[in-house]
Amino acid sequence: MEVTRFAPSPTGHLHLGGARTALFSYLFAKANKGKFLLRFEDTDRERSKKEYIDSIIDSLKWMKITPDEEPVYQSKKTSNHKEIALKLYEEGFAYACDCSEEQLSEMRKDQISKKQKPMYNGLNRDKNIKFSEGMVLRFKFPLHNSSAFDDLILGKISVENKEFDDFIILRSDGTPTYNFSAAIDDIDMKITTVIRGDDHITNTLKQINVFKVLDKKIPNYAHLPMVLGESGKRLSKRDGAEDILEYRHKGYLNDALINYLVRLGWSYEEEEIFSLEKLEGIFDLSHVNSSPSKYSQDLLNWYNNKYLNFLTSDELIFKLKEDFKVDFGELERGDSAISLIAKGANTLKEISEESKYFFQDPLINLESSGIGIDKKEIFMDFKNQLNEIDFQQEEIESVIGIFLKLHNL
């Protein structure tokens, strides 16, 4: 059975790129009759916050991405990770290192001066130092050949092992590091396919070596090319890299955002519109593009306009009242009014802003208009006539015609 996971660090809100990763992981699991799991990699004690955990959970819930089990918290598994790190040390797959910050700094400076890649040079690799409190444990990365895997999106990826150093698996304060903990948790959670951004490729090459020394089956990996901003550069808050719940606050529908996100790098025949239910049956990784996708505000607006107009007038009235406290149900022909506005609107917020004319009289400030007293009386008379008629096209045209003729306008 396929088991996927989404593993955010709760050091901030869920943004567009992370939401796409979560969606692809969820859809791949569902399309293969598998399980989708959620894991919070919350080992950064200073930056990980409960408010971000709650925000990520709320964002996934709004996007209809429901984990099949309760979330896993990496911070609660620290003792297990530490135990396995010590086991690797005892078996010779890791070693104790007592290098000081000063030594490491000098090492980096020397390498940079020689135009070499800054990395740990293995100074203590073969010294058989006895591990004690305050030291770090380093993973014995293979010295020769290459580390490689077949990516389900990008194809064969191979990097020579000399490009890697012996990365730390246990810090001097006794806490495990990300790459080690992530590998152990993927083993414990029985993850079969890891779907994540292509900025994790280096991490993957480290983690598969942890799997090997533990004699565990290596998961399949699929690395998603990044989402670029409209400028072609890395996505920023200015062009889409914002909290997913902000899209809701701006009046975007979750179904529209889901449809838009899945089309950021994935295609299926000539279709553009997909319900979540359909995606759960047809999604696959073979149709994911291996090139970066580009964020488009116009395309997102196009999708949202489509989904707004898929809704019935009653559904629109409900959503507008729920999210923006505007109740078209109070109007005599509110269903017709809201459907009319929705035709040209990109968001619920736009409908809300355009609806004010239905709920309040326009403010006409004749005092500051520079219009003479005689003209003011004419305008007020015209306003009063409009207030008294049934607001139908024929009556409006008749009143305007009589008014213009009466005042020679």
Predicted regions and their residues:
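Glycine-centered flexibility sites
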Residues: 12, 17-18, 33-34, 64, ...
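Conserved nucleotide- and phosphate/pyrophosphate-binding catalytic cores
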Residues: 50, 54, 64, 184, ...
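Short capping/connector residues at structural and topological boundaries
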Residues: 11, 19, 45, 77, ...
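N-terminal Rossmann-like or analogous alpha/beta NTP/dinucleotide-binding catalytic cores
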Residues: 1-113, 203-216
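Active-site cores that bind ATP or allylic diphosphates and position pyrophosphate for catalysis
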Residues: 95-223, 228-237, 243, 268, ...
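Conserved S/T- and glycine-rich ATP-binding loop of Class I adenylate-forming
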Residues: 88, 139, 300
